[in-house]
């Protein structure tokens, strides 16, 4: 996949 997933909690 070429997705960028950036999760900041």
UniProtKB/Swiss-Prot annotation:
Please give the GO cellular component terms listed in this UniProt entry: extracellular region
Q: Does the keyword Manganese apply?
A: no
Q: What's the catalysed reaction?
A: a phosphate monoester + H2O = an alcohol + phosphate
Q: Where in the cell is it found?
A: Secreted
Give the record's keywords alphabetically.
Glycoprotein, Hydrolase, Secreted
EC supergroup of this enzyme: hydrolase
* Superkingdom, natural source: Eukaryota
Give the E.C. number(s): 3.1.3.2
Chief localization class? secreted
An example of a GO molecular function for this protein is:
acid phosphatase activity
- Quick check: keyword Chaperone in the entry? no
Q: How is it modified after translation?
A: Glycosylated.
To which protein family does this belong?
A: Belongs to the metallophosphoesterase superfamily. Purple acid phosphatase family.
Q: What else is known?
A: In L.esculentum there are at least two isozymes of purple acid phosphatase.
Q: How does it assemble?
A: Monomer.
The protein, known as: Purple acid phosphatase isozyme LeSAP1
């Amino acid at each position: 996949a070429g997705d960028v997933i950036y999760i900041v909690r």
